[in-house]
């Protein structure tokens, strides 16, 4: 999904940086990847839901790990400004 957008080496480096459980840093992600909302929003609902967050690393590479439940909940809470359990495009870009 990211062909032509990111170099393979950059994708590998980003995945290696969060390969261990509970090592994902949502602040870094929001800062670096604001452009990728539409790709992470796999069902094209206009929102990123919990399951899409849990599995979003696999968008970069099929062999990537799923986020832990704790990482997913922290990530969702950080981006879900209005408390509806989803991250809308306006929240994602904020």
Curated annotation (Swiss-Prot):
The modification N-acetylalanine is found at residue 1. The keyword DNA repair does not apply. It comes from the Eukaryota. Ca(2+) 2 binds at residues 80, 82, 84, 86, 91. Keywords: Acetylation, Allergen, Calcium, Metal-binding, Muscle protein, Repeat. Residues 36-63, 67-94 form the EF-hand domain. It holds the Pfam family EF-hand_7. The keyword Nuclease does not apply. Ca(2+) 1 binds at residues 41, 43, 45, 47, 49, 52. GO terms for cellular component: cytoplasm. GO terms for molecular function: calcium ion binding. In muscle, parvalbumin is thought to be involved in relaxation after contraction. It binds two calcium ions. Is regarded as an important allergen. Belongs to the parvalbumin family. This is Parvalbumin beta 4.
């Amino acid at each position: 999904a990211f062909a032509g957008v990111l170099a393979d080496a950059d994708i590998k480096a980003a995945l290696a940086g969060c390969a261990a459980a509970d090592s994902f840093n949502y602040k870094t992600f929001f800062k670096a990847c604001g452009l990728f909302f539409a790709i992470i929003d796999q069902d094209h609902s206009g929102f990123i839901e919990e399951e899409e967050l849990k599995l979003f690393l696999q968008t970069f590479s099929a062999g990537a790990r799923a986020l832990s439940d704790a990482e997913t909940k922290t990530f969702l809470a950080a981006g879900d400004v209005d408390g509806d359990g989803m991250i809308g495009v306006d929240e994602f870009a904020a």
